[in-house]
Amino acid sequence: MFFPFSPSNFVSRLFLAVCAALLCLSSSAAAAEGQKSLTTRGELPWTLNADKLVSLEDGVIVEATGSVLLQRGEDYMKADFARYYTTTNWIFVQGHVEARMGRDMLNAAEAEFDLTSRTGWLKDGSIFIAGPHMYVTGEKVDKLFGDRYLFKNAKVTACDGDVPAWSLAAEQAEIEIDGYAKLSHTTLNILDMPLVGSPFLVLPAKTTRQSGLLMPDFGYSSLNGAFFSVPYFQVIDESRDLTFYSTYMSRAGFMPGIEYRSHTRDQDKTWLAFDFLYDKHKFSTEKGDRINDTDGKVNTNEERFWLRGMGDGFVGDSGWRYRYNLDYVSDQNFLRQFRDMRTGFNHSRDALYDMFGRDLQEVDKNRVSEGFVYRDWDRFMVSLGFRYEQIPYLGHGNTPHSEDTTVQRIPLNLYLFKGRMLEELPLELQGEVSSAYEYRAKGIRGLRTEIHPELSLPVNLPGASMLLTGGIRQTYYNSTHTELVDSQRWTRGGGTKDRFIPDMSAELFTQASRVWEMPENHLEATAENVGRTSWTGLRHRVQPRLTYAWTPEKDQSENPIFEEMDRIKPSQRLRLSFTNILTARRETVSGAKGNYKTGTSYFDPVRWEIATGYDIDEAERTKYRNLYGRRPWMDAYSYLELRPVNWLSLWNRLYVSMYGEGITRSDTGATLSNARWGSWSVSYSTRDKYYNYLDEMKRDNLSDMRFTSPQRLLTNTFTFRPWSNISLYYRTQDNIETGKNYERHFAIGYYHQCFHLIGSIQNKARDNSYRVILELPGLNF
């Protein structure tokens, strides 16, 4: 039907159309407002949740208000308000913005991101890097591709809180997560107060091991003057690294050093280090020796160094393995002069023991380098190696190396491991064949070969066990000749020699025990008992042991002396011992609500061994009786360990003369510890001049005897934490016999959340040192 046009009809229809459109928009908005979740577009969509969602412009824009959460997997974004652009996959967030994108933790007042590329910007933004515990903030932050950020007016710190103890302010900072932070026009602030500036600075922003400068070490030493050390750590790969040390000492000069570590697998590891010093303070008389001016030694060399290291591993892909220790030093004073420096003896010794479980020689002993390759089969092993022992004072103005009487060794060993000869018999064989070329610059040198088979027979008796052992030792020497001087060991035994020495031993052992049950001490697994501990049983064991060992007297004075085993001393001894062991069964309640449990463990609070013996050879001794009379009854021996509670341990080793001469040797120690307050350890050791007379009286002649001066050594170590962030340390070691102090060391440490400050004063030998150490945990420069 046709309707003629009229103004009134047109206005009416236009009004109806507008009302219909408004009604439609109102209905759409109302529907959106009723929703609280939507999913974004794309292959990896996000889920948007909020208290209120509103669609605008036909769904092109979605506004979210209240508890906004945008989430995809482990990535998320939280805010008070969000505006999401559906066609471009961009989102604008505002108000208490918190986000995680990959490894990045972000905070901002407002931000805008491309959800596809994860790029964007932040206003008043910050990121937190968990690995080094680093905060980076800026007025304007651009998030670039990957894990890179560009900060304007940046602030970098590892400290929690609004006013950090230290921070770095920069006009611009470029940060890459698990990479580096590059700062330009930087200022170091202490409590937000500027201290010192730098035009450019690079920091690691890594969550893994990173290359970079380590914290410096500085202080003052009366021997070396003011010192300053800056190490640089270089990561080679996940299993290897290098550390370069630059140490300057005002009295000694510049000492560079390098340390290499490798640990590719559990049984394949290496640690090597080398320090070098061009020292202008050489001296040609002992009066110029600042370390020890009473030993008669000098040092005329300017090039000083120390090479040390250890290694274990496999030779290629074969079944052959190797092991070596390196320890070679330029002079007798190097280790003592720099023992407490960052690359000194104490640091190297601890590092090697932690990595290999092996120790260096004491600082004042000869240096020993040795190594060998070996192959281990089921019952057979072959090894070939070397051993070099260095006397550090030789050369550089002292006794020349041509006068060195120390034995250097190239050994070959064949081992036959312990095993039964016949399955039907319990008889077991253990054998060793060894051969070595023994070299010394001055004195007898030559080939030493030894065969040492040994048989053992375990015997089960009623209520006891017995072990019988017997062996022979056949040794051959083929040595050079030199003029014999009886008091000089290195001149003895030229030509072809041999010796044959049998040995045997018998050991009788039994055990008796008794158990006391304490059911009344049982702890129920309840909330009231959580953390409580109780003894619920005791077992006492007594282990008597009687041993007899025999090695006949054999004249070996015509043989060379390359090692201590070239003088096997005669021995015919009986020893009786009783070992008491108290074992406690302990119950402890642990767990959380609804899952309490009672655990059981065992420990030995008391262990006590007492023993004495009789030396048959000593009873018949005719040599040196004018020097020291016969004493066949061996010292009464006692060794006691007490660990009744977790916070207390005591131990004592005691030797008492059976001839009324009192204590000949003792070692006593105690430790009290508390996880909150600290600990105290004390040890006391004594030695009588003749405490080891039984061995010394069997030497070839008087010149071979070594009796030590009486000693009484007291060591105290205290650690005290009056507050959780302050620690005090004190250690002292004194020889009570001579009144001489060997060491005094005091240190105080302040441990803040984002820095550690440690100061120490140490007096050791002739060196008084003062040191300040600043540590920034998790952060290197």
Residue positions per predicted region:
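Outer-membrane beta-barrel proteins and related beta-barrel translocases across Gram-negative bacteria
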Residues: D104, E110-G120, I127-L150, A154-V156, ...
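Post-signal-peptide, soluble extracytosolic/periplasmic N-terminal scaffold domains
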Residues: A31-F145, V230, Q234, R342-H347
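Bacterial N-terminal signal peptides
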Residues: R13-S26
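N-terminal secretory signal peptides that target proteins for export/translocation
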Residues: M1-S12
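Short, surface-exposed coil-to-beta transition loops
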Residues: N49, K78, A169, N741-R744
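Alpha-helical interface/anchor segments and their boundary "cap" residues
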Residues: F2, A29-A30
